[in-house]
Every structure is written in C-alpha cells, then in structure tokens.
C-alpha cells in the first residue's frame, strides 16, 4: 500500500463551493475581496505546449466571465527558476497564483511560506501541503464511460489503454475504464501501456493486433474535434482513426469556480491545519466526454445515460464487485470506495494486463512529474544536489 505522509491531513473537496456566502461566512470573513490580481504561471509559452495552451484557454474564459473584477497576467518560466518568476508575480501585486504544472510545487511551497497572504494553487492532487491548494479532476468518471463505449465497439475482446504517468489517480482511471468495458463486453481484457516509457505506446498496441485504443484525455474543449489520436478510437483497415469517445478538460470552468469561491468568502472557511485539494468531477463541468456522432444510436444513448448517471450520482463506477490481478477481493459491491481509496489505488482489476512501470525505466521528461506525484514517490531517494518535496 502507499505510504503518504500526513495523508489524514488532506481534505479532498470533491464538489465546488456553493454559489454565495452564508451569514456565518460573512461574519467570520471580515474582508471579502472585490477585486483580485491573478497570476498564471506557465512552464513555456502556450504555443509550445497543448497542456499550457489549454490552461491559457481557461485563463481567457476566466477573464471573459469575470471582467473588471479580475486583473489577470501570465508569467512564463523561460530559462528562469520558478521561484524567481513567482517572486516577480507577487511583487507585481498578485493576490492569487495558479501554477499549472506539478513541477512548480516546491517553488510554490517556498513562496507560500514567505507570502502567507497570497493564495497559491497548483495543478496536482493528493498533496499534503497546507500553504498550497491543489486542483485536479476525477478523470476516472470519464474513463468509465469511454470504457463502456470501447467494450461495445471492439471487434474482439482486447482493448488497448495508454496511460500517461504512474501517479496518484492513474490506476483509478485504468480500473474505471476496465470496469466500463466489462459492463458492455464481459470478456473484455485491457492491454495497458505507458506514454512515459520509451517508444510509441500506440504502435506497440497496434503490433499486438489491438484496434480499439484509449489514449490520454484531451486537454481543451477547443481541440476535441481535431485530436482524434487522443481519447478512445478505433483503427480502421486503411489505418485511419474512427473517433469513439473523448474525455476532455474545461479548465475555464474550474478557474471560474475557484475564483468565484474566493469572492464568496469560501477560501477562509477551513482549518489552517488541513491541506485542501480540489478534486472535482463531471458534475462540476470541469470534465466531460464527447461522444462521436459516428457511434451507433444505441451506443450513443448508453453513453449519454452514463454521463447523466455519473453527474447525478446514481452511477458510481466503483460501487461494484472487484477483484485485482492477484485474485484479491477489493470491493464486495455493497458500497463505493472513498475518494482517498480511489486516489491511492496502486493495483489493477483482474481484466487488466499490465503493471506500474519502474521509475528507472521512465523517459527523462516524465521523471520529475512522477517524482512529485508518483505512486512510489516516498520510496525514491532524493535527487543529487536537492531534496525530495
């Protein structure tokens, strides 16, 4: 099992705050801001990264919706240290900082100690740091739906799944996909591969004869119609891709809701001893699934029913009987798993073929993210010349 220091001190907020402050909130919060200066910290210019561009799209949505109530500026790391860029943003008057990459956590923690009146948020999850709030989404909800679609659309019982990094929440997405596929195809088996390993994971799956593949989720609503190589797709005989269902992020919805919660006074209504992690699902609007218009009507209808059920809470992917790869019963089906149990999964369902890759095998560009957010981060030795987060 995963040993996460101070895990009990993490408060997972699984739903956005209410629309407005109550009487007690107004009393406890003598000063609720009327205007906020907001800084977005990027690892590179938006045109160089789809991930950064997606967050920049979210930044634009925030500005459009809140108008004169916010002043928003972007700060790009370039060749500078993250800490240096943060200090410049704070000196410029930033009240709120959105750090859009997990590699920024260490710099945010240091800055939060020096600037306790600035609100710091980092795009990560399951982090026990009280000075920096984390934000992310329950992607497993989307993967359950795309798994059901894949199970219905495969010509065989074998479906490929490309996971990005072995970090908190990834096994939950794999398992939810596997459970969804089993729901529509009882004999479905999921062949797991990893984008963090050398080589092309999609090509490896194709070489094994897999023709329905779940790739990583799409990072922005603006690209959901064009990036068919992401999401879940079928490879046709001529090599072209038939899109089936694509999970996608709407970061603008998340940024809008978080900033509105600050304006409503919700930010101060928590204990200072707890680390706050926002982990929202499809019901919040932060995540959704685009069902392809090319799906058969019945599969389209099923996908829509699953979307509605997950959003209203009547469908919970992990409220089912589950065995892991070693035959151990993980849930008897009488209850769902807690958010903490879901996030900390380090096992796979019995219809998944694959395992968590060793840290030593990862591509260098993935290593830092896994060192910070990885399932086995507590077992890693500190890097030479620096300490672990």
Sequence positions of predicted segments:
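A residue-level marker of the well-folded mature domains of exported/periplasmic proteins
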Residues: 3-389
């Amino acid at each position: 099992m995963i040993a996460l220091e101070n895990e009990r001190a993490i408060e997972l907020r699984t739903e956005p705050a209410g629309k407005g402050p109550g009487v007690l909130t107004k009393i406890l919060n003598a000063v609720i801001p009327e205007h906020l200066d907001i800084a977005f910290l990027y690892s590179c210019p938006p045109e160089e990264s789809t991930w950064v561009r997606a967050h920049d799209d979210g930044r634009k949505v925030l500005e459009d919706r809140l108008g004169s109530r916010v002043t928003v500026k972007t700060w790009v790391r370039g060749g500078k240290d993250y800490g240096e860029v943060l200090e410049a943003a704070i000196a410029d008057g930033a009240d709120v900082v959105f750090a859009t990459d997990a590699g920024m956590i260490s710099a945010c923690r240091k800055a939060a100690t020096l600037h306790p009146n600035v609100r710091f948020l980092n795009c990560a999850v399951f982090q026990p740091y009280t000075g920096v709030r984390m934000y992310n989404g329950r992607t497993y909800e989307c993967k359950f739906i795309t798994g059901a679609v894949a199970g219905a659309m495969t010509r065989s019982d074998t479906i490929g799944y490309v996971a990005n990094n072995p970090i908190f929440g990834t096994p939950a997405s794999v398992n939810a996909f596997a459970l969804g596929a089993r729901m529509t195809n009882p004999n479905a088996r999921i062949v797991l591969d990893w984008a963090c390993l050398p080589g092309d994971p999609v090509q490896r799956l194709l070489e094994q004869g897999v023709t329905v593949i779940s790739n990583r989720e799409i990072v922005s609503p603006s690209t959901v119609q064009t990036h068919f190589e992401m999401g879940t797709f079928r490879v046709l005989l001529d090599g072209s891709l038939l899109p089936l269902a694509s999970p996608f992020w709407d970061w603008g919805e998340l940024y809008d809701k978080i900033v509105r919660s600050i304006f409503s006074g919700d930010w101060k209504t928590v204990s200072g001893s707890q680390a706050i992690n926002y982990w929202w699902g499809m019901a919040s609007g932060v995540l959704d699934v685009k069902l392809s218009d090319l799906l058969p009507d019945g599969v389209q209808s099923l996908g829509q029913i699953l979307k509605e059920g997950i959003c209203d809470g009547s469908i919970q992917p992990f409220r089912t009987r589950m065995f892991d790869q070693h035959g151990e019963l993980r849930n008897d089906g009488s209850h769902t798993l807690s958010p903490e149990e879901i996030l900390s999964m380090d096992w796979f369902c019995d219809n998944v073929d694959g395992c968590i890759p060793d840290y030593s095998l990862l591509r260098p560009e993935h290593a830092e993210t896994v060192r910070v957010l990885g399932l086995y981060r507590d077992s890693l030795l500190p890097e030479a010349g620096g300490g672990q987060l």
